[in-house]
């Protein structure tokens, strides 16, 4: 009996040792090495893009405070988004990150924007809170960001990350195969505009990569930086065949199609002015949903050549990565030109 009581503490010690936290070190997209205690059970995301990486990898329930790209009030959220994330009224945040609020949240880990939040990251690290910084503005950087996120979320997340990357590559390859016989000069010339009719993308923006993956050519590819303001004269010189409007902001196709100053454009004369659909995240940004942006644009650009089933791609994406079943109306919204 004495031997049993002597042995018992060692048995318990070994049992609790198995429950102890481990640690991993990751290299974030700013080049910083970040030590993270595992398992990560509570996450704050002040990066509206990075938030969606967490959801797509099956860990959205670990978010305690979250930014959502383009969303600054619950009242602006779609019915679909509120149905997808019922906790949105409790966890939504926006604006400049509040250090005191982030510390008080008790989060194990903060996800932040590498182009905006370096000072915030430094302050939090000094307080002992690890921060992962993201910078994803190309397809390769998006896939890298998803893989990075999975590396601290666990094996199930890593499996989902591999599946997502395979799906993204499959989408790009399928469109490329369908358009293999298309000559470079026959590629659709596309103007992509943002929150005003003269606010256009540059060559350094993710939207340019999406257009190219969908088989098009951006007429504003000579520009650099972020969004550029141009004049109507420049747009008339470009004379795009297709105009795509970002899925946010006030601009609608009718604003261009019915504007007398735009009537000489090829895109207007043929009626090929479209606004991208949006259900949850804007699909022109480097979020996982952007693979649907490729599919949607490819079908809009080349409806007779691209053979992928857009409806099936939409249904499968939301089911597989967001665990979300679309209504018939939502599916129609995401598949109409």
Q: Which ranges hold each PLM region?
A:
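Solvent-exposed loop/turn segments at secondary-structure junctions
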Residues: 49-52, 69-72, 109-110, 115-118, ...
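A short, structured surface patch at a secondary-structure boundary
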Residues: 45-101, 109-114, 219
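Alpha-helical, coiled-coil/dimerization segments enriched in small aliphatic residues
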Residues: 201-227
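Bacterial N-terminal signal peptides
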Residues: 7-16
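Sec/Tat signal peptide C-region and signal peptidase I cleavage site
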Residues: 16-22
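Positively charged n-region of N-terminal signal peptides that target proteins for export
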Residues: 1-6
């Amino acid at each position: 009996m004495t031997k049993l009581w002597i042995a018992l503490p060692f048995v318990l010690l070994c049992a609790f040792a198995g429950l102890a936290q481990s640690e991993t070190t990751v290299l974030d997209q700013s080049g910083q090495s970040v030590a993270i205690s595992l398992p990560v059970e509570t996450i704050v995301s002040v990066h509206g893009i990075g938030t969606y990486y967490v959801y797509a990898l099956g860990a959205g329930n670990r978010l305690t405070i979250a930014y959502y790209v383009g969303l600054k009030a619950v009242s602006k959220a779609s019915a679909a988004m509120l149905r997808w994330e019922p906790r949105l009224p409790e966890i939504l945040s926006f604006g400049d990150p509040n250090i005191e609020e982030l510390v008080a949240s008790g989060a194990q880990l903060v996800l932040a924007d590498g182009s905006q939040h370096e000072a915030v990251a430094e302050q939090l690290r000094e307080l002992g809170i690890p921060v992962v910084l993201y910078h994803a503005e190309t397809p390769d950087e998006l896939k890298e960001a998803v893989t990075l996120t999975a590396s601290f979320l666990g094996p199930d997340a890593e499996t989902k990350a591999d599946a997502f990357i395979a799906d993204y590559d499959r989408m790009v390859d399928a469109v490329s195969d369908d358009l293999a016989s298309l000559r470079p000069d026959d590629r659709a010339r596309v103007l992509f505009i943002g929150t005003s009719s003269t606010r256009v993308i540059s060559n350094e923006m993710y939207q340019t990569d999406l257009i190219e993956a969908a088989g098009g050519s951006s007429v504003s590819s000579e520009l650099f930086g972020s969004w550029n303001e141009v004049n109507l004269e420049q747009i008339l010189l470009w004379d795009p065949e297709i105009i795509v409007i970002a899925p946010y902001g006030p601009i609608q196709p009718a604003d261009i199609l019915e504007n007398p100053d735009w009537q000489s454009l090829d895109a207007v004369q043929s009626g090929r002015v479209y606004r991208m659909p949006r259900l949850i995240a804007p699909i022109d940004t480097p979020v996982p949903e952007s693979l649907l942006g490729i599919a949607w644009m490819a079908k809009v650009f080349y409806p007779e050549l691209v053979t992928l089933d857009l409806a099936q791609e939409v249904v499968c994406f939301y089911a597989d990565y967001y665990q979300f079943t679309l209504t018939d109306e939502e599916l129609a919204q995401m598949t109409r030109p």
